[in-house]
């Protein structure tokens, strides 16, 4: 039976138009862009695994992001605000300034042999030059391959080889609260390890980092000198279907998958999503606390804001410790951001350090309209804490590296709808979402299953995996023909709201019962002294697997460990059921996570089951892995 939470008429009509005639719907949206050759066809689709959006159109996304706003008289509007808590700097770049820098650096790249279709690896921290590099590569029709700053040399080498990058653009280092991450040794070692050698290397030399080009390789080029030495060049018209970038997923396989995104479809999706999902328009300020090395940074720090004529805040700092748990609120206040978007792990860190939300009260937050969250499931306890402290709508939404922009969201610009804690709301127009059983058959409302999306995927989503068409099919389409397999489990309720319970590989089997660790974590995280929780399944002789919870306490927690265990066991039994057979709790100081905030559950499981473990390349703080290993109980089978 439907409830008062049903989505509104405007949403339903828009979704229906996008579902019934996706080619015409997206062709209409694409007319908001400034095309070199406007498309006459919205979509070519073979009915199986190949689709092309705007196949006869031509544009360049760098032109969309910069030139057209300068030509429209917005040249003096701020495009990028760099806010570095690490260097105590705030620097604003207008659209005209960004266009000049991007055009000059594109000329430098061209002078050193970079052109249409060449791959360029970018390895930089959260500095404006990262955006300049990305847009300059795109301007030439080359393909950028952004690799998260601070990745170990072997990970960088893997991406160098996979992309066969002609050039590398890097900085000499990144800044963390307790250390400097030296990039140049990593670049040098990565090139040595890689079978494929880049022809040219550009280095942005930051004065805060001691390492210099001369100490490593005198043939490497200075980023700033090269930019200054060249005259601006025009953007190269590109087929809408030409690749814009490769972005490697941090999957569980030994070889990361390189997602391909195109110019035209991505530009159209970015331009549509910003006003409709985030309610951000040209001239407004947005703060996305992520990194350009991840998909969130690509789409909502770089491309969507600039393609839409908005102002994007590039933040170099942490949610806590730079200098305190008010860091995000300070950034919002300083720059008048209309929205903030970060991962639940960041919000949980703020809550753990400032449970009463005292830092929020220190700042003028009147410009802020909405608090967005994505990257992992937003547990209800964190949701309610954020809503109470901020007094703003707290909007979860769900998407993936592969999709490039949200699959499920509460469309705050198109048609704001009631929020349901635990749900990122409804499928975004363009994404026809279903829940199916292992045989691919749709299941009823409220029934858990595999979340899938009907093909073809909309503009902005991946169009393939670089050099691996067979893997593209086997990874995403083989299991459920006609659908994209998201790899997540969940259900859709009677109002059409989607509830994402976790990765299908985050399901544990306890005595024949399949249990979602995400649901268990949500129940545990509701306890007032628990700041964060992770549940993993460990081997058990009787039940096959049993759930074990690892909890991080709030800063003001004062509780006996055995008392807490008893309370959590009782809570899970009451809220989830005895079927969980839950009775094991460990208190730890921190949970091992990737740099994008995802909990390393597989690594945790390996540690507690006594396996030899090396720190994954994606880990944020290697020291946390050591402390977890010391604090966690062993569960060897």
Residue ranges and their predicted role:
Residues 310, 338-342, 351-418, 432, ...:
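Gly/Ser/Thr-rich phosphate-binding loop
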Residues 267-285, 295-339, 352-358:
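Conserved AMP-binding/adenylation subdomain of ANL enzymes
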Residues 199, 203, 542, 574-599, ...:
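AMP-binding/adenylate-forming catalytic domain of the ANL superfamily
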Residues 76-78, 201-204, 214-248, 255, ...:
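Conserved pre-ATP/AMP-binding loop-to-beta segment of ANL
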């Amino acid at each position: 039976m439907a409830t008062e939470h049903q989505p509104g008429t405007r949403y339903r009509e828009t979704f229906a138009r996008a579902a019934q005639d996706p080619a015409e719907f997206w062709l209409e949206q694409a007319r908001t862009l400034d095309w070199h050759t406007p498309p006459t066809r919205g979509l070519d689709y073979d009915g199986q695994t190949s689709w092309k959006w705007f196949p006869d159109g031509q544009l360049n996304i760098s032109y969309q992001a910069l030139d057209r706003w300068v030509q429209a008289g917005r040249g003096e509007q701020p495009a990028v605000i760099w806010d570095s808590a690490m260097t105590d700097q705030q620097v604003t770049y207008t659209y005209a300034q960004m266009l000049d820098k991007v055009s000059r650096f594109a000329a430098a790249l061209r002078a050193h042999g970079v052109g249409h279709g060449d791959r360029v690896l970018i390895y930089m921290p959260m500095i404006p030059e990262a955006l300049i590099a990305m847009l300059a590569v795109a301007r030439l029709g080359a393909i950028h391959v952004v690799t998260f700053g601070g990745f170990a040399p072997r990970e960088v080498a893997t991406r160098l080889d996979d992309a066969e990058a002609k050039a590398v653009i890097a900085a000499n280092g990144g800044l963390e609260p307790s250390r400097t991450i030296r990039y140049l040794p990593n670049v040098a070692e990565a090139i040595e390890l890689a079978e494929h050698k880049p022809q040219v290397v550009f280095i942005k030399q930051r004065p805060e980092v001691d390492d210099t080009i001369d100490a490593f390789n005198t043939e490497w080029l200075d980023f700033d000198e090269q930019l200054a030495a060249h005259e601006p060049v025009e953007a190269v018209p590109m087929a809408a279907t030409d690749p814009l970038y490769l972005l490697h997923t941090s999957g569980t396989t030994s070889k990361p998958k390189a997602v391909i995104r195109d110019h035209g479809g991505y530009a159209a999706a970015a331009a549509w999503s910003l006003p409709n999902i985030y309610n951000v328009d040209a001239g407004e300020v947005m703060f996305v606390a992520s990194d350009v090395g991840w998909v969130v940074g690509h789409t909502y720090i770089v491309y969507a804001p600039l393609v839409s004529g908005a102002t994007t805040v590039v933040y170099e700092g942490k949610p806590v410790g730079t200098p305190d748990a008010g860091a995000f609120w300070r950034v919002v206040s300083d720059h008048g951001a209309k929205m903030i978007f970060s991962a639940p792990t960041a919000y949980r860190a703020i809550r753990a350090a400032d449970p009463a939300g005292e830092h929020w009260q220190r700042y003028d937050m009147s410009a802020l309209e909405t608090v967005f969250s994505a990257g992992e499931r937003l547990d209800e306890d964190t949701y309610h804490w954020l809503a109470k402290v901020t007094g703003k709508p707290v909007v979860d939404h769900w998407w993936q590296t592969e999709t490039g922009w949200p699959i499920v969201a509460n469309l705050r610009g198109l048609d704001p709808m009631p929020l349901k804690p635990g749900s990122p709301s409804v499928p975004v127009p363009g994404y026809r979402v279903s829940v199916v059983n292992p045989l691919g058959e749709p299941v009823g409302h409220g029934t858990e299953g595999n979340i899938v999306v009907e093909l073809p995927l909309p503009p902005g989503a991946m169009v393939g995996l670089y050099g691996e068409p067979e893997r593209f099919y086997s990874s995403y389409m083989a299991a459920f023909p006609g659908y994209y397999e998201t790899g997540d489990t969940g259900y859709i309720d009677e109002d059409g709201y989607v509830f994402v319970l976790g990765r299908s590989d985050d399901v544990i089997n306890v005595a024949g019962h399949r249990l979602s660790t995400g649901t268990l974590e949500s129940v545990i995280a509701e306890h007032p002294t628990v700041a964060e929780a992770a549940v993993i399944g460990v081997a058990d002789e009787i039940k096959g697997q049993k759930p074990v919870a690892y909890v991080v306490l709030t800063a003001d927690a004062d509780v006996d460990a055995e008392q807490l265990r008893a309370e959590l066991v009782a809570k899970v039994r009451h809220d989830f059921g005895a079927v969980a057979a839950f009775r094991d709790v460990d208190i730890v100081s921190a949970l091992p996570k990737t740099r994008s905030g995802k909990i390393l559950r597989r690594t945790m499981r390996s540690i507690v089951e006594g396996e030899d473990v090396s720190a994954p390349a994606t880990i944020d703080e290697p020291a946390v892995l050591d402390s977890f290993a010391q604090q966690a109980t062993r569960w060897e089978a």
